[in-house]
Amino acid sequence: QLIRAAQQNGIRCIVDSSGEALSAALTLGNIELVKPNQKELSALVNRDLSQPDDVRSAAEELVKSGKARRVVVSLGPQGALAVDETGSVQVVPPPMKSQSTVGAGDSMVGAMTLKLAQGASLREMTQYGVAAGSAATINHGTRLCSLDDTQKIFTYLTNA
């Protein structure tokens, strides 16, 4: 109900959920950005997505069906695969020593939300999201990413 009300008022919706909540949100359609991980996407489309092309195809299906405008599949240490109507991009983070993955997904979604609001391309949005998610993993405990670490990793990714 919340997503429907927001959309009726012209508010773009971003969904980072799983299971029934993710499925229900996508049933409404026109979600601005959805960020499942590979396992969540596999459950959503009800098939194994063990190969990169399978993940890309499943994400493309969500976009082509109108359920989501952008799908960014988080792939853990392999980064993220992003798909929209213009195509797809995979962003792989630099090798880093991970201290904790707590908060990495939230950092990623927050960073991508910022870039969406700024009108960034799919590539830039995904690079910034991967940078923020990676920055969160170098912290101990439950700390989210820092702007300084995010910017450093983003610069690395844009120059790679």
Residue ranges and their predicted role:
Residues 4-9, 24, 52-160:
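Conserved phosphate-binding/catalytic region of the ribokinase-like
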